[in-house]
Amino acid sequence: MSRRRKHGDSSGLKQTPRKAMATEEGSLVFESGKRRLRAARGSGPQGPGERPPRPLPQQEQPPVAASCRKSNTEERYETPKRMLQMDLLSSTFSSPNDPDGQNDIFWDQNSPMTKQLDKGRKKQLYTTDSDEISHIVNRIAPQDEKPTTDSMLGVWIGDTAIPCTPSVAKGKSRTKLSCTKLKSQNQEEELMKLAKQFDKNMEELDVIQEQDKRNHDLIQMISEAETSLNCRDNVQMQLLCDTVPEIDKALLKKPVKENTKISVVNDQTSSQKPFDQNAEAAFIAMFDGSTQKCSGQLSQDLSDSFLKTSNTTFGKKNTLKEEKIITNESVVTENLPSKTLGSLSHQVDNPGMTKSYVTFCTKEPGTFNKHIDTFTTSDFEDDWENLLSNEPFVMQNIETSELFPAPKTIQIADQKEMCSFNSKEAKSKSGMNKSVDVKLRDSKILQGLPSNTWNNELTDAEKYRFSPKPNDKPNKLSTTGNKMKLEKSFNIVVNQDKIQDCAVASNLTKVNEDTHTKFNCKVNASEKKSALKPGCSNKSIFNQSLKVPANVKPFGSATLGSTTSVCNPDQTNGSKLGSFFDDWNDPSFTNEIVKACHQLENSWEADDVDDDILYQACDDIERLTQEQNIRVDSKTSESVLEINNSSKHGAKNVFTTPKQGSQFMQSKHLNLNSISAQTSSLANSLQINKSVKMERGEMYGNSPGFLGATTNLSIYSKNSDCQISNLHVSCNNPDVPKQVNSSKSVLTGSSSLNVGSHHMSTEIAASKNRLSTLHLSKSTTRGKAQSDLNRAVRLSEYVFTKMKNCPMLSPFNNSSVTGSISDTKIAQGLEKNKTVNPLPGKAVQQQPLVKFSEPLKQPSKEEEEKNRKCSPEEIQRKRQAALIRRMAKAQASSVKKGR
């Protein structure tokens, strides 16, 4: 290559300018073909000949050599043409068949490059190594370089974007398709195998069915033999059923203290159907052992199967012990005989009746008579009794023979667990607030009810209509899925467990307008003997009722239909907390209640935060009420309801606020010298938020609680359509009592109510479809009373007036001083949005407790500490004493009735 370079240089020296121009024309051809590097190579050997001063060294060459160079130069002119043809064949410089091109690229790195200028002039350009290398690289493989973009979108969007490689996707799809075809072929083969296996199994099944048919024939022969025995048992059972009522009465006199009767269905009253032999054989084949007693159950009618099952049990075990068990646990079907004392019959063909009821009755203290289906065995019956004792919907009606000699019947619905009861009051004794629950707690209430109480009836789902009836007559309960028809003497408990729908009609009289409800009842504390009655229910506790708003849907709107005290404990916590009332002098409690009281004592003693919150709330409200200077003398006129609930001791009470979270609130060791009242508001709608507004605008929660202790609390209700004028209200009901405050006669509604209670909770209910809730406003004195009454309030109102000098039969009335009255305004409703404070959902400490008390003599801290320390011991002592008394009376009564 070095020799060729020298040869090229020497030949270039002998070039004439004309020949150099021809070479330039060849180089222009290369440049037009974008072969600048080739043009540089072609002009490189001739470059020195471009300059005219260079011919001086050419003369030094010998002439022979000059002729050789001349011939070589002519051959050299043809070289670019040959290279051009090679370049046309190979479009790139990367061809390995072009050694000259490769040599020129790498060998002549420092050679000058010529560039055509205007008018044929040349300019020699000198480039560095880095520039040539970058130029060469860009010419060799420019398509491999991708411009760098600031955003990653440039990789996928634009002219230089990477394609989406559809070929790869197609390849994958073809692969999947081939796999699918392969799988489909395999599935066909598998289906053929399965079909063959199925044929084999069917052949085996035919053999098995033939064997089963032979076995069935054998079983049918055995069943026919047993059927003949059952016929004999039925004949014996027919004789036994004639003596069942006498056995039942004889057995019930011993454990039950004339407060419960069992409705026994006579076999003669219902038609007997023979057992289905095929069903009998099928059950014998399915079951073995003692479970064969339930044969024929599933293929028969409900009531007939109950009777036949009890017949079978009677027939197979003819001992006296079995007769007692069946009598104590006899099946009560839907057909209750009308001759049963204390209850009217539930007819199966009643169009309003959609659920079957089971009648429960109470035994001696400590046990229950649970009437369950007797198609189960004796072992399972024992377990079922244990289960029923723990079930939250099981209710117990307890009553003493001294107070209520008439029997009671409790009827419980299974499906929705609606619990209600029919009660009959004694002719000589006055009725009282009755509620039932398996686990009654240790609280104390004294309530008296005169004999002229009212029975009520809930007849419409949207309207409450109440008709008074003599309380000597027995009561009737008929219910549907969403409508309750209630007739009862004082308080009625309706429990629906899962759907917290409660409809309560209590102590209400019929008003002239259907849309209004007046609550007319009277309780006197003087009748303490007839007032000692526990009032508890598993889900709904109704102690006193104020008013039922108009157009209330009891079940459809999922709200409480009457303004009563309602406690809806959660099902899981129902065994621990609830609103419970008890009087330890009442001998009708059972040992079960005493055990429950002991269990509840631990939770009370362990929770001291509630006491602190209660005392703090009481102190704050007492301080606010004492700062009020508006006081007038008052006279108490006759009122429709006067409740004097007084307790000898500061017994513990658990009040439950039935919001959706089923929150619980405990109030313990109430101050005997102070008054507090609790009003629970039940509404299954978050849109109804009630608020308590003090005179100074202090909020205590939307569901205020009043726990009354010593002073009277006068509550006056106003119908929703009554317009209050300055000093009077026009009402169509002539029976509305009047409340006289000083010299001003104020008529504040169709019903009024004086409440002075120690443990009394009042429930104001609101319906979901009617957002106009009850407003609690005050009927105060002089100018402020007029200003409040001037407002035309369409929503129903309750006026709370606390009277210091009110005749009460209360042992704590000595701390009340006569002569003055303090009025406190409570505003409750949706219109008072500025005072709305939603009820706390979780914390028990934040439950609203509003205590209205203004005794002249404030209780000292020492007295409070003393009451707080002594109340648990007193309760324990009373429990022990009550337990001893109950056991003694139970034994005495059992001995007396056994004779």
From Swiss-Prot:
Processing and modification events after translation: Phosphorylated by ATR.
A Gene Ontology molecular function term of the record: protein serine/threonine kinase activator activity
Predominant cellular place of this UniProt entry's protein: nucleus
UniProt keyword annotation of DNA damage present: yes
Alphabetized InterPro entries for the sequence: ETAA1
Region (Disordered): 1-82, 833-899
Classification via Pfam families: ETAA1
Annotated coiled-coil segments of the chain: 180-210
BP-aspect Gene Ontology terms: DNA damage response; DNA repair; mitotic G2/M transition checkpoint; positive regulation of protein serine/threonine kinase activity; regulation of DNA damage checkpoint; replication fork processing
Cell location: Nucleus
Modified residues (Phosphoserine): 467, 810
Extent of motif ATR-activation domain (AAD): 105-111
Residue(s) of cross-link: Glycyl lysine isopeptide (Lys-Gly) (interchain with G-Cter in SUMO2): 416, 444, 485, 539
Key words of the record: Coiled coil, DNA damage, DNA repair, Isopeptide bond, Nucleus, Phosphoprotein, Ubl conjugation
Keyword Cell membrane: no
GO terms under cellular component: cytosol; nuclear replication fork; nuclear speck; plasma membrane
Chain ranges for the short sequence motif RBM2 motif as given in the UniProt record: 868-890
Chain positions of motif RBM1 motif: 607-622
Source organism, top-level taxon: Eukaryota
PANTHER family per record: EWING'S TUMOR-ASSOCIATED ANTIGEN 1 (PTHR16434:SF2), EWING'S TUMOR-ASSOCIATED ANTIGEN 1 ETAA1 (PTHR16434)
Subunit comment: Interacts (via RBM1 motif) with RPA1. Interacts (via RBM2 motif) with RPA2. Interacts (via the ATR-activation domain motif) with ATR.
Role according to the record: Replication stress response protein that accumulates at DNA damage sites and promotes replication fork progression and integrity. Recruited to stalled replication forks via interaction with the RPA complex and directly stimulates ATR kinase activity independently of TOPBP1. Probably only regulates a subset of ATR targets.
Domain notes: The RBM1 (RPA1-binding, also named RPA70N-binding) motif mediates interaction with RPA1. The RBM2 (RPA2-binding, also named RPA32C-binding) motif mediates interaction with RPA2. The ATR-activation domain (AAD) motif is required to bind and activate ATR.
Protein name: Ewing's tumor-associated antigen 1 homolog
Organism: Bos taurus (Bovine)
Classification lineage: Eukaryota, Metazoa, Chordata, Craniata, Vertebrata
